[in-house]
């Protein structure tokens, strides 16, 4: 069964979808699903916005758990909270752990002022270098989420990622993931853009050339209408 391995429900502050709606949407899309609620310790703009009661999460959602409905978490990577994050992961029976870059050196990538004074090249170099630093530190995760997260929010005319601009950094990141046995996610959120598909395809091809064998597909759904979205495009 094909799984949508990235979605947010009742325990994610920014989600407008509950678990029952997600299950119905996944069945309609004929996909399995992994709930991956947000967990971001010390989030720059609001330190408590993306935390939740993990024990209650399992207590309430365990009844839904099955071969086609799994319970995971999406951990926001930051170098100074590795110990806290990994203690949380070890303490709970997550079926899947996504590790993602939502911040760079203590700045929220969602916020426009995080890019003040930076050219696109400078912002991307910092993003890749901090991604590499975090992947070196974090051990207990399964999937590295949305490599193009920064493309959603960086305020530049061209928001795409080009392998040829930072080949050494992309290679280093991919090799770390491969050597660590981690899976690279194809996040389907931006796959409605042909330009995004074309530029991301180059990156995923390079990941494969370096020895990457596995990818995951994730819609990053926060609404029921987005569960399983663009999975056919991602499969190609």
Which role does the model predict for each range below?
Residues 33-35, 97, 144, 184, ...:
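Hydrophobic residues within beta-strands of alpha/beta enzymes
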Residues 25, 63, 133, 176, ...:
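Alpha-helical scaffold elements within enzyme catalytic domains, especially in hydrolases
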């Amino acid at each position: 069964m094909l799984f949508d391995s990235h979605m947010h429900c009742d325990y994610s502050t920014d989600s407008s979808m509950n678990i029952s709606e997600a299950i119905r949407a996944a069945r309609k899309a004929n996909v399995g699903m992994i709930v991956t609620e947000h967990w971001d310790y010390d989030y720059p703009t609001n330190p408590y916005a993306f935390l939740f009661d993990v024990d209650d999460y399992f207590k309430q959602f365990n009844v839904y758990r099955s071969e086609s409905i799994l319970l995971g978490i999406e951990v926001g990577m930051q170098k100074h909270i590795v110990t806290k994050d990994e203690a949380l992961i070890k303490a709970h029976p997550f079926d899947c752990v996504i590790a993602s870059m939502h911040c760079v050196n203590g700045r929220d990538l969602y916020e426009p002022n995080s890019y003040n004074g930076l050219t696109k090249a400078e912002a991307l170099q910092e993003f890749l270098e901090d991604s590499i630093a975090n992947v070196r530190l974090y051990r207990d995760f399964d999937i590295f989420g949305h490599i193009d997260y920064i493309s959603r929010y960086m305020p530049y005319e061209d928001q795409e990622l080009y392998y040829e601009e930072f080949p050494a950094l992309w290679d280093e990141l991919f090799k770390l993931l491969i050597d660590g046995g981690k899976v690279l996610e194809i996040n389907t959120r931006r796959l409605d853009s042909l330009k995004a598909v074309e530029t991301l395809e180059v990156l995923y091809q390079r990941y494969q050339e370096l020895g990457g064998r596995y990818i995951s597909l994730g819609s990053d759904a926060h609404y029921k209408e987005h569960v399983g979205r663009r999975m056919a495009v991602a499969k190609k």
